[in-house]
Amino acid sequence: MRGIILKDLYEGFCIKKNLINWLASMIFTSALTAISEFMRGAYGFLLIVVLLFPVMGSTLLQMTVEQDEKAEFDRIQLTYPLSKSEIVLSKYLGGLIVQGGMTLYSFVFVLIYVYGYRTITLEDALPTWGIGVVGGVIYFAVSYVAYFWLGNLKGVIFTFLAMVGLVIAFLLSVFNIGLEEIMQVEKSIWISGCLVMAAVLMVISYFLSLKIYTKKHS
């Protein structure tokens, strides 16, 4: 399992194209918050911490599926002394490592918005960040099933449509409900409910992906 995890992490961060994508995304986001007053405000905080970085954490599988399809690695790894459940589990563990890394990177931005831009207080920022963390895990669970089921090309289309849908939902929430009202919502209730949902969805996601993978390679 460790070999597959390391292979996936290598493909995600050491292949030039993927590394450039990661660096470009992070540098662009950092630069945008530095030069744009809008992005330094509460809207930018919500967009980055609750939506953008949590969703970026689940992109490792897309990168590895793309490489695996090119090299037909799915067939090769079936010859390893690993069960199909261990192969699928290794994909999830590698993805969760990246998800955890993006969670920490997102927390750095929380500190920047609190102590640098002084956009939000730490008391309000931490629960909001928590919602982003849990929301990212929920998106992770859904997107991993999508990539195991659809493959790389259709999976990319799914990711694009999902991102468009999430951005539209974010904008509608902000402008229909109001930014102040959203920030004042009792976030502990959201986090508690979403934690349970995330845990359940992650378990369901793993077993669905395992079933899909087993059916494809039976």
Predicted segments, located by residue:
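Hydrophobic alpha-helical transmembrane segments of membrane proteins
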Residues: 1-71, 90-218
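Long, low-complexity intrinsically disordered regions
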Residues: 74-75
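Short helix-to-coil transition segments within interhelical loops
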Residues: 78-84
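Alpha-helix N-cap/helix-start motif at helix boundaries, enriched for small hydrophobics
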Residues: 86-88
